[in-house]
Amino acid sequence: MNNNDPLQIDYWDRRKMLFGLGLGAGAFLTPGLYAESLMNPTPKQTEGPFYPDKMPLDTDNDLLVIGDSITPAVGEVSHLSGTVLNVKGQPVKNALVEIWQVGDKGVYLHTKDNRPGRDENFQGYGRFLTDSKGRYYFRTVKPVTYPGRAPHIHVAVTVKNKRMLTSQCYINGDKRNEKDFIYKRLGKVGQKLTSVNFKPIKGTKTNELDAVWDIIIGLTPED
């Protein structure tokens, strides 16, 4: 889509479609569910060298299609969604969630990533502003590996112009995680908090996947 609005794709229209395809409403947390005890925050991880140094013309939350193009990116279509919460279990509204990742051939949208085969139809970066219940949503591709790294998606969360978290998420159960030096140093708790299940969505013609990852950040000044 030819728009840089973080709320470009209507969140609820997409979620209603997914619910209709057999996904339960339990994919989202009830606000304050864990408010009686502090939650473990999503562990901070390196931003890495490939945060886009030149933003694409399109920075919305649909990474599969750039601008008015009718040619989608190559890869397993994945719907990544979840809730941004603070450690009290309270939803964080108006949080800017950014993601960036390699395309199907393992190449980033970055001028210094000169490996061949970058998918010109893959946006490579997207952003979304959480709603009043702290929810976010992206349509992207299932992450793939490249030399030295297990498949992963980078994420950053910013609240009122303050970067609250920089992290990464991984495919739960992927054997390549065991050899990834960043994943290994997270420890068991950190690994659990950043491992995401990519589950097939019944009824989709292209075998689309649903991935739910709740992101826990530290307290903001308002908290």
Which residues are covered by each model-predicted region?
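Membrane-topology and secretion signals of cell-surface/extracellular proteins
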Residues: 21-22, 77
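Peripheral, solvent-exposed domain-edge segments
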Residues: 4-6, 10, 20, 218-223
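N-terminal secretory signal peptides
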Residues: 1-12, 25-27
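Beta-strand-dominated extracellular/periplasmic modules and repeats
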Residues: 36-197, 204-223
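Generic hydrophobic alpha-helical segments
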Residues: 24-25, 89
